[in-house]
From Swiss-Prot:
Annotated PROSITE patterns: ADAM_MEPRO, TSP1, ZINC_PROTEASE
UniProt key word Glycosyltransferase: no
Notes concerning its domains: The spacer domain and the TSP type-1 domains are important for a tight interaction with the extracellular matrix. The spacer domain is also required for cleavage of COMP. The conserved cysteine present in the cysteine-switch motif binds the catalytic zinc ion, thus inhibiting the enzyme. The dissociation of the cysteine from the zinc ion upon the activation-peptide release activates the enzyme.
Entry protein name: A disintegrin and metalloproteinase with thrombospondin motifs 4
GO BP, sorted A to Z: defense response to bacterium; extracellular matrix organization; proteoglycan catabolic process; proteolysis
Reaction equation(s) it catalyzes: Glutamyl endopeptidase. Bonds cleaved include 370-Thr-Glu-Gly-Glu-|-Ala-Arg-Gly-Ser-377 in the interglobular domain of mammalian aggrecan
Gene: Adamts4
Top enzyme category: hydrolase
SS bond list: C289-C341, C318-C323, C335-C419, C373-C403, C445-C468, C456-C478, C463-C497, C491-C502, C528-C565, C532-C570, C543-C555
TSP type-1 domain location: 516-571
Region (Disordered): 180-204
Entries under PANTHER family matching the protein: A DISINTEGRIN AND METALLOPROTEINASE WITH THROMBOSPONDIN MOTIFS 4 (PTHR13723:SF38), ADAMTS A DISINTEGRIN AND METALLOPROTEASE WITH THROMBOSPONDIN MOTIFS PROTEASE (PTHR13723)
């Protein structure tokens, strides 16, 4: 049984986000709900389109003014547009907040014809007929216009007409203009009355302890199915989705300054030797992870380098038992070039949350319903956050759960995000406009449910959940995946959605202004981790004065401080070290080791443990020799190893002095006296070469001995002699009864002392430890062959005898002496000369 039997290694387990089937507002069985609502809709709305007005228009481009330097885009664009009997004059200018400078699309393979090469467009904003209350938000590719117009309470949607002819003036050609009916207008209603008393429908679904800016340089890949579905709008769509994902990572609930940066965009065409994208999510992920590594450059400073890669596909992904899978990623792999990758099934604009979810796994986050998260989130805290196991409406006020924030913080604090500290030389700006301005409710439905879907406007309340048209068994129906309308989607006259609520457009301005955060005061010191022997206590502060808003910068700097506490020695009755106590707590955990013959005696394992793993609880079964990581961290204040006074703090080895104070420079001398000068002990050394078959005594090392070192030297017969240790009671601590310990091990001695043994199979055996020994120890040698010219050398330090000082006479003796002298002075001879 390997270590993985207890603690699966990060990255070996894939996680996927599930989606709900179309769900309707009734509390009975879902399939019956679908049939019932489809039937009601077939009566109230017999296959007729949703109420809206449409007409074909030909926008006329008027003369633009000067060209913006280096961009080829006019500084001001004028368009004249006939609209439902009225002529509209659009005064447009480039929106500086939505440029994506420097980003070029890389096409691999044969690009679909509808792509037509890279999308050269830009984002425009402006007014209509000079009305300051009007809003024009359009995407312009040099000809065609796509976007939303809001004018005098009307909401107009403009998009190119596929196959439309150019107008007579050589303008951008035929467009379709739709005027949507106000949400309050009367018309065919889709209402279902729930039984009396039923609940309302609801949605389901690298400095230590320092906050440092992280920059996640991301490769975004879209497969040929994405290209075929989105056509020329693919680049804009991908950037819009990634902008929403980046916005989620900027929310203060993640408690870290994480910047998601798109550095490369690759679109795959047919015939490309790319990743194998198929129904199996696991196989697709493995194929993509292998393929993306070939695109990366190992040099982190190279502009083409990326820290993680994400694949978007329209392929229906399947897990082990169902095809309700929206994405998959390895866990805790962000700086592993081979496994820092994720796949996302495109499901409309809400795919931004799928992307954020999968990248959360890459940052070592678990699902919010996992056992560790249940303890951190509390009851009912697992359904409205990004890392919920099933896609649902994400709480805009707290998109990341306390568990997600804790796991990414610990992950970064432990040094696993080292590759994210370099800031891109030329950061690329993702679209800053709200996605709902570019993608109206109808388009959002098409992205989610297909090109024939449109918005069902009669299902209140607006913004909370996007309801879209569809068909079931020939009957019209409305369906939802419980995702809210995209932020910025018009929801009424001078109103737009934000966080699932319909707000006045003036209120949206509050969401556009970033506010940087500031540190609050330090909190009180917490409890000490130990009652004696040197513990640790913490104090922390939060980024709350003020809390960052609207993508504002999260606080940087030290967020947690710690100090030593209860540094006095533990009582002499403590037979075990602090680490030994933690291992011994597993002595009766037979439920974790069912393959073992019975309860095991667990002791610390130091030999063979890498320095980076010193603060994991690695314990060894004394009888079997197997060792396992029983806990990912030892308790705070546990010494990192027997050879150092440094202690573990939150899973990391922190320097401490021999006085058990963190940051202290005090050291043990050879006598193991803290801060001593080495004068209290003397070195004893010698050699041994009188070998005979069997066991022979070499030297008895006295109690109190320190810095013990035993080493074999020279000769061709070293393999025939072995070290052994015998305790004062006659029992063996090492290699007794002709039974050898072949591999490196820690020899645990009475008094919580251990010696490090190289193992009997080592080319040259060694035995070492700091001590001091609690009782005498006899060093022996076991001879099993013909040792020629072999020699054994040993050394250790023993306390010097304390020089005796004359004891002062007792007080009563001094008093009696004074009385005797007084009597003698009174004798007759006392005054004679």
């Amino acid at each position: 049984m390997s270590q993985m039997g207890l603690h699966p290694r990060r990255g070996l387990t894939g996680h996927w986000l599930q989606r709900f089937q179309p769900c309707l507002p009734l509390h009975t069985v879902q399939w019956r709900r679908l049939l019932l609502l489809a039937f009601l809709l077939s009566l109230a709305w017999p296959a007729s389109p949703l109420p809206r007005e449409e007409e074909i228009v030909f926008p006329e481009k008027l003369n633009g003014s000067s060209i913006l330097p280096g961009s080829g885009v006019p500084a001001r664009l004028l368009y004249r547009l006939p609209a439902f009997g009225e002529m509209l004059l659009l005064e447009l200018e480039q929106d500086p907040g939505v440029q994506v400078e420097g980003l070029t699309v890389q096409y691999l393979g044969q690009a679909p014809e509808m792509l037509g090469g890279a999308e050269p467009g830009t984002y425009l904003t402006g007014t209509i007929n000079g009305d300051p209350e009007s809003v024009a938000s359009l995407h312009w590719d040099g000809g065609a216009l796509l976007g939303v117009l809001q004018y005098r309470g009307a909401e107009l949607h403009l998009q190119p007409l596929e196959g439309g002819a150019l107008n007579s003036a050589g303008g951008p050609g035929a467009h379709i203009l739709r005027r949507k009916s106000p949400a309050s207008s009367q018309g065919p209603m889709c209402t279902v009355k729930a039984p009396s008393g039923s609940p309302s429908p609801i949605s389901r679904r690298t400095k230590r302890f320092a906050s440092l800016s992280r920059f996640v340089e991301t490769l975004v890949v879209a497969d040929d199915k994405m290209a075929a579905f989105h056509g020329t709008g693919l680049k804009r769509y991908l950037l819009t989705v990634m902008a929403a994902a980046a916005k989620a990572f900027k929310h203060p609930s993640i408690r870290n300054p994480v910047n998601l940066v798109v550095t490369r965009l690759v679109i795959l065409g047919s015939g490309q030797e790319g990743p194998q994208v198929g129904p199996s999510a696991a196989q697709t992920l493995r194929s993509f992870c292998t393929w993306q590594r070939g695109l990366n450059t190992p040099n982190d400073s190279d502009p083409d380098h990326f820290d993680t890669a994400i694949l978007f596909t329209r392929q229906d992904l399947c897990g082990v038992s169902t095809c309700d899978t929206l994405g998959m990623a390895d866990v805790g792999t962000v700086c592993d070039p081979a496994r820092s990758c994720a796949i996302v099934e495109d499901d409309g604009l809400q795919s931004a949350f799928t992307a954020a979810h999968e990248l959360g796994h890459v940052f070592n986050m678990l699902h919010d319903n996992s056992k560790p998260c249940t303890n951190l989130n509390g009851q009912g805290g697992s359904s409205r956050h990004v890392m919920a196991p099933v896609m649902a409406h994400v709480d805009p006020e707290e998109p990341w759960s306390p568990c997600s924030a804790r796991f990414i913080t610990d992950f970064l604090d432990n040094g696993y995000g080292h590759c994210l500290l370099d800031k891109p030389e030329a950061p690329l700006h993702l679209p800053a406009t709200f996605p709902g301005k570019d993608y109206d409710a109808d388009r959002q439905c098409q992205l989610t449910f297909g090109p024939d879907s449109s918005h069902c406007p009669q299902l209140p309340p607006p913004c909370a959940a996007l309801w879209c048209s569809g068909h079931l068994n020939g009957h019209a129906m409305c369906q939802t995946k419980h995702s809210p309308w995209a932020d910025g989607t018009p929801c009424g006259s001078s109103q737009a959605c934000m966080g699932g609520r319909c707000l006045h457009v003036d209120q949206l301005k509050d969401f556009n202004v970033p506010q940087a955060g500031g540190w609050g005061p330090w909190g009180p010191w917490g409890d000490c981790s130990r009652t004696c022997g040197g513990g640790v206590q913490f104090s922390s502060r939060d980024c709350t004065r003020p809390v960052p808003r609207n993508g504002g910068k999260y606080c940087e700097g030290r967020r947690t401080r710690f100090r030593s506490c209860n540094t006095e020695n533990c009582p002499h009755g403590s037979a075990l070290t602090f680490r030994e106590e933690q291992c011994a707590a597993y002595n009766h955990r037979t439920d974790l080791f069912k393959s073992f013959p019975g309860p095991m005696d667990w002791v610390p394992r130091y030999t063979g443990v890498a320095p980076r793993d010193q603060c994991k609880l690695t314990c060894q079964a004394r009888a079997l020799g197997y060792y396992y990581v029983l806990e990912p961290r030892v308790a705070d204040g546990t010494p990192c190893s027997p050879d150092t006074s440094s202690v573990c703090v939150q899973g990391r080895c922190i320097h401490a002095g021999c006085d058990r104070i963190i940051g202290s420079k005090k050291k043990f001398d050879k006598c193991m006296v803290c801060g001593g000068d080495g004068s209290r002990c003397s070195k004893q050394s010698g050699s041994f070469k009188k070998f005979r078959y069997g066991y022979s005594d070499v030297v008895t090392i006295p109690a109190g001995a320190t810095h013990i070192l035993v080493r074999q030297q020279g000769g061709s017969g070293l393999k025939s002699i072995y070290l052994a240790l015998k305790l004062s009671d006659g029992s063996y601590a090492l290699n007794g009864e002709y039974t050898l310990m072949p591999s490196p091990t820690d020899v645990v001695l009475p008094g919580a002392v251990s010696l490090r043994y190289s193992g009997a199979t080592a080319a040259s055996e060694t035995l070492s430890g700091h001590g001091p020994l609690a009782q005498p120890l006899t060093l022996q040698v076991l001879v099993a062959g013909n040792p020629q010219n072999a020699r054994l050398r040993y050394s250790f330090f023993v306390p010097r005898p304390v020089p005796s000082t004359p004891r002062p006479p007792p007080q009563d003796w001094l008093q009696r002496r004074a009385e005797i002298l007084k009597i003698l002075r009174k004798r007759p001879w006392a005054g004679r000369k």
